[in-house]
């Protein structure tokens, strides 16, 4: 079967934003106008097509990125193929955003016209910067009270440090919002309310807005000619680019991430969505426009590139595992090069295992269509893979490659969980393993001492939803303990320890002596090991044993048994025995050496500090600040945002449990907050003593 759409007509993009900026609604409108959805789903009545998990429909927030393929006819009359990923905006699910950005070519960043750039907008924006994803901006909810397009433009500069190229101006705002001015064509688009936004009239720019439109068109031209020498020279000579040249320059600047074209509208009231879709075609990259993906040759370890070309060897990245009630486990993958046929055998180079593709599906939210073949640029769901997890590379067994791995954050909160009945015991283990395979930011472990099952994640909501899914999807009833903070330990001063391990009573003996300097790692939270052995006092083949021994005890610090961060170990001397020394003997010696040293090197307890942003009406500012201070919070600053006040603070996670209830009652439900992990910080000594007493009893 031949390719239906040329690869240059593909647009793989995501929609990213703060919670409640209208992502799912915007995606719903896109599906409606591109003909994939016959009825518009509304988030607040629980019928949105993209939000297909039960909890999403109940809570009105998007948890999993649903991948959807749809089609759109551009201004030139040609059909384009869109692969859209709808991502969650709640901070507990940033891992989903990170995963989808990794496999997209472009993104639309959505802003709420009333709130502008919000904390989670900053977080997802930074994630997109990390992967250098070209972005457009859609200022949504222009019909909302307090909507201010121009303030949002300013906030993009001050808060994100980015350049927004304004492509449209709003006509009216709040309830008076009628349409937009197109600054390229210099005309106005007014939507007809009775047509559900499917029809609009192209009219002249209103008289009272002509001067503003001229001013913003001039700014647009000044910004875009700046990226091209010939265009700059022509502009300085008084020759202005024509409309097609403007579009070409905007496209180039967007793909090179020099600036971000900005549009406006209200998805809920069906205004502004179609021009946004035209802009996706005009300005976001096709798989051909972005640099070839880099990887490591599986055999030679040389760096190689794979281009978006069907004739190159197959390479794809698994970016999401999802449990589907009808098909079982589904692996979502982005094909970077080559083509894939149903039933093909591929190799997972990360696990070094062969996999067979049983079924291949093209997804529309939660409905699906079987396909026989997929090509470079496609995003597909594969059934029948046994070994593959998120971040793995799947490729041609004859030309194996490992594509860049994804990095996943460490969980900051954990809870103990117990099955209610004996029957739930086995089902719970299976359910938790399935859920952990789907979500790399969720971890499951067994406490060695108590035998309890501990689950860890990115926040209270994250773990609530995991427990909820266990009940609904796997029919497992469980009792959940109180949330526990993921504390860490470190050392604060340099200490040299000399340790000899000897066991020479009958049979093969064991002997190893190590002299190691332990100190805080100046380069960060990682563990760093160095060997400065000269003259062979510890033979080369035993040195990995020394490193392994220390690493094996880093998971349990001396104070309260928490994992250790930021330790540097330098092996400076030692001794061995011709017969009795072994890698294992050096492993045992270094393990004991570190245990001894950790107590003497100023061991210190660390706690996760959260970056908290509270948005509150002015009347409650005093109460909110007082309350944050009482939680050992450090106020970093405050600023006005319209009629509200934004308070920024760093607060220990330990003191933020159930904060949402407190904030609601303090502000009569009018204040909101967001919280993201910021850094680990030393615990004050009085609090540390309590924590040690509590956890040492459990060690």
Swiss-Prot record:
Organism whose genome encodes this protein: Rhizobium johnstonii (strain DSM 114642 / LMG 32736 / 3841)
Protein family membership: Belongs to the TRAFAC class translation factor GTPase superfamily. Classic translation factor GTPase family. EF-G/EF-2 subfamily.
Gene Ontology molecular-function annotations: GTP binding; GTPase activity; translation elongation factor activity
Name of protein: Elongation factor G
NCBIfam families: EF-G, PRK12740.1-5, small_GTP
HAMAP family in the record: EF_G_EF_2_B
PROSITE patterns per the UniProt record, alphabetical: G_TR_1, G_TR_2
Gene Ontology CC, one term: cytoplasm
Transport in keyword set: no
């Amino acid at each position: 079967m031949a390719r239906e759409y040329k690869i240059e007509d593909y647009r793989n993009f995501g929609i990213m934003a703060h919670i409640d900026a209208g992502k799912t609604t915007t995606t719903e409108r896109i599906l409606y106008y591109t003909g994939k959805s016959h009825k518009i789903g509304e988030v607040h009545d629980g019928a949105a097509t993209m939000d297909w998990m039960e909890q999403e429909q109940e809570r009105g927030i998007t948890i999993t990125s649903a991948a959807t393929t749809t089609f759109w006819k551009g201004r030139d009359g040609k059909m384009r193929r869109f692969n859209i990923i709808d991502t969650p905006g709640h901070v507990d699910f940033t891992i989903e955003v990170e995963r989808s950005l990794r496999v997209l070519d472009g993104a639309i960043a959505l802003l709420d016209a009333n709130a502008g750039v919000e904390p989670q907008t900053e977080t997802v924006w930074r994630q997109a910067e990390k992967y250098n994803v070209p972005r457009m901006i859609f200022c949504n909810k222009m019909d909302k009270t307090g909507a201010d397009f121009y303030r949002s433009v300013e906030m993009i500069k001050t808060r994100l440090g980015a350049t927004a190229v304004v492509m449209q101006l709003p006509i009216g705002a709040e309830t008076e919002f009628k349409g937009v001015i197109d600054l390229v064509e210099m005309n106005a688009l007014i939507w007809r309310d009775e047509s559900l936004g499917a029809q609009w009239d192209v009219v002249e720019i209103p008289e009272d807005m002509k001067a503003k439109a001229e001013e913003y068109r001039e700014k647009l031209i000044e910004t875009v000619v700046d990226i091209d020498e010939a265009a700059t020279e022509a502009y300085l000579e008084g020759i202005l680019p024509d409309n097609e040249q403007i579009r070409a320059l905007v496209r180039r600047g967007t793909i090179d991430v020099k600036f971000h074209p900005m549009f406006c509208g209200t998805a809920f009231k069906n205004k502004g969505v179609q021009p946004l879709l035209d802009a996706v075609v005009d300005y976001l990259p096709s798989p051909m426009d972005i640099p070839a993906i880099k990887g490591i040759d599986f055999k030679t370890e040389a760096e190689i590139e794979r281009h978006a070309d069907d004739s190159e060897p197959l390479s794809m990245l698994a970016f999401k595992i999802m449990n589907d009630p009808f098909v079982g486990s589904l692996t979502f993958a982005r094909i970077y090069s080559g083509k894939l046929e149903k039933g093909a055998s591929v190799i997972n180079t990360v696990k070094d295992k062969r996999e067979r593709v049983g079924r291949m599906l093209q997804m529309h939210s939660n409905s699906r269509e079987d396909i026989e073949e997929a090509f470079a640029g496609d995003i597909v769901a594969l059934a029948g893979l046994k070994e593959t997890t998120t971040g793995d590379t799947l490729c041609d067994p004859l030309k194996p490659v490992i594509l860049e791995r994804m990095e996943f954050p460490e969980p900051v909160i954990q809870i103990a969980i117990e099955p209610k009945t004996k029957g739930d015991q086995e089902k719970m283990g299976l359910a938790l393993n399935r859920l952990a395979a789907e979500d790399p930011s969720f971890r499951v472990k067994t406490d060695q001492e108590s035998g309890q099952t501990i689950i860890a994640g990115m926040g209270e909501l994250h773990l609530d939803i995991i427990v909820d899914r266990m009940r609904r999807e796997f029919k497992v009833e469980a009792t959940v303990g109180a949330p526990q903070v993921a504390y860490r330990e470190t050392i604060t001063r340099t200490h040299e320890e000399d340790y000899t391990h000897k066991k020479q009573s009958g049979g093969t003996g064991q002997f190893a002596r190590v002299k190691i300097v332990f100190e805080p790692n100046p380069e960060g939270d990682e563990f760093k090991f160095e060997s400065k052995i000269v003259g062979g006092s510890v033979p080369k083949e035993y040195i990995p044993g020394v490193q392994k021994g220390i690493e094996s005890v880093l998971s349990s610090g001396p104070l309260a048994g928490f994992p250790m961060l930021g330790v540097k170990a330098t092996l400076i001397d030692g001794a061995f025995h011709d017969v009795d020394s072994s890698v294992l003997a050096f492993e045992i010696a270094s393990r004991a050496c570190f245990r001894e040293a950790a107590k003497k090197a100023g061991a210190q307890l660390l706690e996760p500090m959260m970056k908290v942003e509270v948005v509150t009406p002015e009347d409650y500012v005093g109460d909110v600040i007082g309350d944050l201070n009482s939680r050992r919070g450090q106020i970093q600053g405050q600023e006005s945002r319209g009629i509200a006040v934004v308070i920024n603070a760093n607060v220990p996670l330990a003191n933020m449990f159930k904060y949402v209830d407190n904030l609601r009652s303090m502000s009569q439900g009018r204040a909101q907050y967001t919280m993201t992990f910021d850094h680990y910080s030393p615990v004050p000594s009085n609090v540390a003593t309590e924590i040690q007493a509590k956890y040492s009893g459990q060690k």
